[in-house]
């Protein structure tokens, strides 16, 4: 919760064995949600590591267990490399796509008394954010936006902090829809925001009439696309910080690897001369929003 609300790294400390096992579910959730998290846990003494001797705190394959649910997992083998491992783990947790990184510290290393090094006060975590990305691809995206009249942004978890940028794209004539994780990027009372009603029949029919859909920071995961059977526009552009997102669930006409904030800012600067928005298009989006809200309220009456 701290990491998600503060944009800082969360830190959790557990005991070894059952303590480490109990945090597995939370690490899975943090990884899925892209939450930057540093998990520190214990381990048996160095001389007993990986021998499966049943010594106190001995948990076979604990490091592998942590690796399976984290972005990565490290073991501090000596008090001499504490700072090095911490820096590496923090950097990895903060590098997009962000997520949890685990560190296990053998009990004898924990008990080692060391002098605090001056370098501990000057730790700088490198910002590895992917910047704007390929300018040639941005040229192609600009061209597609200029050609389109009926266009929509699909905002996922990776774009949920882009309130200002999304509002500017509404000024360019974009409607907005979100995944569940992307909710709150703008006020859902906004007339051009369809909320997270992204897979209902009326909205799917609406998709078929669109010239363009731009997906920002969303997996388009099965839960929100009817296991990838939801029909999305053929002219689909995907913007994501994760290179593995390309064609993972849906084929995209254009995939752009870059920081969503910087990409949308750059595109808006190119496109802010677009002023003549079709009033009929705006009216259609507003009418659809009223319909789906009415349908949902009727549905809730059953409960």
What are these regions (language model features)?
Residues 1-4, 155-237:
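Glycine-rich, anion-gripping cofactor-binding loops and their flanking helix/strand elements
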Residues 4-14, 20-41, 67-120, 144, ...:
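Structural signature of the thiamine diphosphate
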Residues 15-20, 41-48, 158, 180-185, ...:
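Acidic, glycine-rich active-site loops and adjacent beta-strand->loop/helix elements
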Residues 46, 65-69, 113-126, 187, ...:
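Gly-rich Lys/Arg/Thr-decorated short loops/hinges at beta-loop-alpha junctions or inter-strand turns
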Residues 55-64, 231-241:
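Flexible glycine/proline-rich, aromatic-decorated loop/lid segments
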Residues 133-144, 302-303:
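A short, well-structured juxtamembrane/interface segment
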């Amino acid at each position: 919760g701290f990491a998600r609300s503060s944009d800082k790294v969360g830190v959790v400390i557990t005991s070894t064995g059952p303590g480490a096992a109990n945090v597995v579910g939370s690490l899975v959730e943090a990884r899925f949600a892209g939450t930057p998290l540093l998990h520190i846990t214990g381990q048996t003494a160095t001389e007993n590591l990986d021998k499966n001797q049943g010594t106190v705190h001995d948990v076979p394959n604990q490091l592998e267990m942590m690796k399976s649910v984290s972005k990565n997992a490290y073991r501090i083998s000596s008090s001499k490399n504490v700072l090095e491992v911490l820096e590496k783990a923090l950097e990895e947790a903060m590098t997009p796509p962000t997520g949890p990184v685990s560190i296990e510290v053998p009990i004898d290393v924990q008990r080692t008394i060391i002098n605090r090094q001056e370098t501990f006060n000057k730790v700088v975590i490198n910002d590895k954010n992917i910047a704007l990305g390929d300018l040639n691809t941005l040229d192609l995206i600009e061209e597609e936006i200029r050609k389109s009249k009926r266009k929509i942004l699909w905002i996922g978890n990776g774009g949920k902090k882009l309130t200002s940028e999304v509002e500017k794209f509404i000024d360019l004539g974009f409607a907005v829809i979100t995944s569940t994780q992307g909710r709150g990027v703008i006020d859902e009372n906004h007339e051009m925001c369809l909320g997270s009603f992204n897979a209902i029949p009326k909205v799917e029919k609406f998709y078929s009439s669109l010239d363009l859909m731009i997906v920002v920071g969303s997996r388009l995961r099965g839960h929100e696309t009817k296991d990838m059977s939801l029909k999305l526009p053929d002219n689909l552009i995907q913007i994501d910080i994760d290179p593995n997102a390309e064609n993972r669930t849906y084929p995209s006409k254009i995939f752009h690897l870059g920081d969503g904030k910087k990409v949308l800012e750059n595109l808006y600067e190119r496109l802010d001369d677009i002023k003549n928005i079709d009033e009929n298009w705006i009216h259609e989006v507003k009418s659809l929003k009223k319909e789906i809200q009415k349908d949902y309220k009727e549905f809730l009456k059953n409960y």
